[in-house]
């Protein structure tokens, strides 16, 4: 009996390797957020570019800063869909808290609640990297910085996102005064000076990071509330 060889079969009848479409649950839409806290204020910045994870730009007008209360904002980079889901959850819980207690949640309490929320989702986490910035009950400016599963730290400056490695050295040098041989004594820096520095920082990140650009939102949080400003970055 003649044996049929595989090589004798028509090309269409040969068994082809089975390929599976890989499901990617997450995409990093890029962008940069940063914040600097002063004695009685916080300055937060975030660009408005949303990329598709590659070289495409999906929109140039996506704000990464979300106001939580009159004394607190959330700045987020990462996946836009998860960012929106997280914002909705926080907004719902803050509204419920205010209705039940008759007052808005304090900034430190919001920071802890966000940590709990992210940790609760740790087995399928929100692909978001967050900064909570605002003033506390004593009127002092603070920032809380997070990883994706809720580990957080209270600091005076921080950044997140695709331009993080470009911005952090500037913040280390100019805010914390690291790697300087001669450091002046502690002195209060005006909010206007910090705003100018933050603008320069995110502009610098936009020149080197293709996922950061178009426009930047600058937000100042102080005892009088939340104040917004927008300025243009590179558009290419």
UniProtKB/Swiss-Prot annotation:
Coiled coil: none
Example GO biological process: proteasomal protein catabolic process
Pfam families: Proteasome
GO cellular component, one term: cytosol
Keyword terms, alphabetized: Cytoplasm, Nucleus, Proteasome
Function per UniProt: Non-catalytic component of the proteasome, a multicatalytic proteinase complex which is characterized by its ability to cleave peptides with Arg, Phe, Tyr, Leu, and Glu adjacent to the leaving group at neutral or slightly basic pH. The proteasome has an ATP-dependent proteolytic activity.
Subunit text: The 26S proteasome consists of a 20S proteasome core and two 19S regulatory subunits. The 20S proteasome core is composed of 28 subunits that are arranged in four stacked rings, resulting in a barrel-shaped structure. The two end rings are each formed by seven alpha subunits, and the two central rings are each formed by seven beta subunits. The catalytic chamber with the active sites is on the inside of the barrel.
UniProt family annotation: Belongs to the peptidase T1B family.
Protein known as: Proteasome subunit beta type-1
Record lineage: Eukaryota, Amoebozoa, Evosea, Eumycetozoa, Dictyostelia
């Amino acid at each position: 009996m003649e044996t049929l060889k595989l090589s004798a079969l028509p090309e269409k009848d040969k068994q082809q390797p089975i390929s599976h479409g890989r499901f990617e649950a997450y995409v990093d839409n890029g962008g940069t957020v940063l914040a600097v806290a002063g004695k009685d204020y916080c300055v937060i910045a975030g660009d408005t570019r949303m990329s598709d994870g590659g070289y495409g730009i999906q929109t140039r007008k996506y704000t990464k800063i979300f106001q939580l209360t009159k004394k607190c904002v959330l700045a987020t980079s990462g996946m836009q869909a998860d960012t929106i889901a997280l914002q909705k959850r926080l907004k719902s819980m803050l509204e419920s808290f205010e209705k039940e207690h008759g007052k808005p949640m304090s900034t430190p309490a919001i920071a802890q609640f966000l940590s709990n929320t992210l940790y609760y989702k740790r087995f399928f986490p929100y692909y978001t990297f967050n900064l909570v910035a605002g003033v506390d009950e004593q009127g002092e400016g603070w920032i809380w910085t997070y990883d994706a599963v809720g580990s957080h730290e209270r600091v005076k400056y921080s950044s997140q996102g695709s331009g993080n490695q470009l911005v952090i050295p500037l913040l280390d040098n100019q805010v914390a005064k690291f790697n300087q041989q001669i450091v002046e004594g502690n002195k209060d820096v005006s909010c206007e000076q910090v705003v100018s520095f933050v603008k320069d920082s995110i502009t610098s990140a936009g020149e080197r990071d293709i996922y950061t650009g178009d426009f930047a939102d600058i937000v100042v949080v102080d005892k009088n509330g939340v104040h917004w400003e927008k300025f243009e970055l590179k558009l290419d």
